Amino acid sequence: MCIRDRDIFSLSQESLWLITVVYDLGLALLLYRFFGKYGLYVAVVLGIVLGNLQGGKVSELIIFGSAYKVSMGAILYSGIYFSTDLLNEKYGKTEANRAVNLGFFANIAVLLTLLLSLLFKPSDLTGSALEVHNALSVIASYSPAFIIGSLTAYFISQKFDVWFFNYLKTLTQGKYLWLRNNLSTIISQLIDTFIYTFTWVIATDLSIYDAFYIALSKYIFKIFIALIDTVFIYGVRNLNPLVKNDE
């Protein structure tokens, strides 16, 4: 029996949110297990690219009777912190920073490629060609201020996360993984959310009040994700990748 689209979307949005978080973190874990640090590089690139592509997909979740506006991109983007923290924990600060740099340049490359593709006129052979062209136009038509702000938020917050995680690890002599994982991520996400929200106000007609409301909702869920990924990072802490010569 086929499940209609409306039946799928009538499922609990809160359950779908949790499933997506577990899927995102689980994917990063599998990439690490089979490909080592290179798999985590891929996880970071996927997180930043897919997170930005789906940043405009906003849903409403009801938690304890309160409504929260949550971006789909925020879920995928938050998973990046799990990957960089795992890289930092297993391979060191240099490898974590390399993953951040790869994600930054990959995001620019995807954006430039989308812009180049829009220079080609869609064929009139089928109606779908125009539909795809218009869809790509929507994705690639963010204002320069929004793009610059998004990249800036990513780069600054991720660099801080890598540095602070390593600093806490040194300070605690390698103890209290839960502390450095959560504290570095929560503070870094606050930096990212602040820069991103400031960009929204500049690049759109969104009021400061609405921007703050959305930012607060996103930040609360980012904290939830940080708490969830603590379980994953402890689960994989003593797990070695299947590939050899992974150092």
Locations of regions flagged by a protein language model:
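Conserved small/polar residues in nucleotide/adenosyl-binding loops
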Residues: 1-5
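Structural signature of hydrophobic alpha-helical transmembrane segments
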Residues: 7-20, 67-79
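Transmembrane alpha-helix/helix-exit interface in multi-pass inner-membrane proteins
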Residues: 101, 105-127, 154, 158
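N-terminal signal-anchor/start-transfer transmembrane helix
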Residues: 18-33, 161
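A generic, lipid-embedded transmembrane alpha helix
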Residues: 43-60, 73-81, 110-115
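Membrane-embedded alpha-helical bundles of multi-pass transporters/translocases
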Residues: 137-145, 149-157, 167-172, 180, ...
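Internal alpha-helical transmembrane segments of multi-pass membrane proteins
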Residues: 171-190
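Membrane-interface interhelical connector segments
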Residues: 117-145
